[in-house]
Amino acid sequence: MEIFPAIDLKEGRCVRLYQGEFSKETVMNEDPVAQAIIFEKLGAEILHIVDLDGAIAGESLNLPVIEKICKAVRIPVQVGGGIRSLVTVEKLLSAGVEKVILGTAALYDKSFLEEAVRLYKEKIIVGIDAKNGFVATRGWLDLSEISYVSLAKQMESLGVQTIVFTDISKDGTLAGPNFEQLAILQKSVGIRLIASGGVASIQDVKKLNDMNIYGVIIGKALYEKTIDLEEVLQVTKLC
């Protein structure tokens, strides 16, 4: 199982939100580059970065910081948030990003998604963020009428190989992932699933591993130290 330590960027800083509420932010590190280096030194093999400003604006606003992170670490970096054009995809890949995560665009701009998948194949990941089972977009501000399962099936049919699934109600809560929705999703599609939101303990990670979930994004639990990164990396290697 892949472990993805998370760095959420807002106004150039590393922050955490509570249930996706931008008004409920906590600054975890004023220097995201330093935080990336810390994760790498602890053994992280890949980083998950979200441009929160970009998710709202619809364009990558933290590109300079992302580029600095890519230059500062030797491990791969995947980035999401505000990626709604091929130009932005190309800028991020040129900056050293390994994979990009499309969210809003996957729902509202299928032609862009299809072209991105055609050009960059496995480098394109789709992020599905759900609230009460329905897909939320534009930085989680808008709630659609499309179920997370329906969108996942559409993405699989378009050639997407990996999905990041987030239950927004769990994000930043340390209340545990939405195992039920993840299980439904896994039965519905045959592509890689990365779980995100609410992961609070090594037991959560072990349960996801037992479900054969491909990867898990861990954010607040690492900063609050309810999960030790070195320990969880060791545990997942032994599973």
Swiss-Prot record:
CDD domains: HisA (cd04732). It is found in: Cytoplasm. InterPro entries: Aldolase_TIM, His_biosynth, HisA_bact_arch, Isoase_HisA-like, Isoase_HisA-like_bact, RibuloseP-bd_barrel. Its main location: cytoplasm. The keyword Protein biosynthesis does not apply. It catalyses: 1-(5-phospho-beta-D-ribosyl)-5-[(5-phospho-beta-D-ribosylamino)methylideneamino]imidazole-4-carboxamide = 5-[(5-phospho-1-deoxy-D-ribulos-1-ylimino)methylamino]-1-(5-phospho-beta-D-ribosyl)imidazole-4-carboxamide. The keyword Isomerase applies. The active site is at residues 8, 129. GO terms for cellular component: cytoplasm. One of its GO terms (molecular function) is 1-(5-phosphoribosyl)-5-[(5-phosphoribosylamino)methylideneamino]imidazole-4-carboxamide isomerase activity. Its EC number is 5.3.1.16. Keywords: Amino-acid biosynthesis, Cytoplasm, Histidine biosynthesis, Isomerase. Pathway: Amino-acid biosynthesis; L-histidine biosynthesis; L-histidine from 5-phospho-alpha-D-ribose 1-diphosphate: step 4/9. GO terms for biological process: L-histidine biosynthetic process. It comes from the Bacteria. NCBIfam families: 1-(5-phosphoribosyl)-5-[(5-phosphoribosylamino)methylideneamino]imidazole-4-carboxamide isomerase. Belongs to the HisA/HisF family. This is 1-(5-phosphoribosyl)-5-[(5-phosphoribosylamino)methylideneamino] imidazole-4-carboxamide isomerase. It comes from Bacillus cereus (strain ATCC 14579 / DSM 31 / CCUG 7414 / JCM 2152 / NBRC 15305 / NCIMB 9373 / NCTC 2599 / NRRL B-3711). The gene is hisA.
